[in-house]
Curated annotation (Swiss-Prot):
Similarity comment: family membership: Belongs to the bacterial ribosomal protein bL34 family.
Pfam families registered for this protein in UniProt: Ribosomal_L34
GO aspect biological process, one term: translation
Protein's name according to its UniProt entry: Large ribosomal subunit protein bL34
Keyword Metal-binding: no
InterPro entries, per the entry: Ribosomal_bL34, Ribosomal_bL34_CS
Gene name linked to the record: rpmH
Molecular function as annotated in GO: structural constituent of ribosome
PANTHER family: LARGE RIBOSOMAL SUBUNIT PROTEIN BL34M, MITOCHONDRIAL RIBOSOMAL PROTEIN 34 FAMILY MEMBER
Keyword presence, Ribonucleoprotein: yes
Length: 44
């Protein structure tokens, strides 16, 4: 059986990247929450 996680940098960026997060209100909320928490990496 094939494993469920088949890494791909392109797909990772397209679904969880910074630009994708900034597109929606909820995504911006995620970025802001991570900024407030002091995360080193905001998105992928």
């Amino acid at each position: 059986m094939k494993r469920t996680y088949q890494p791909s940098k392109t797909r990772r960026a397209r679904t969880h990247g910074f630009l994708v997060r900034m597109k929606t209100r909820g995504g911006r909320a995620v970025i802001n929450a991570r900024r407030a928490k002091g995360r080193k990496r905001l998105a992928v």
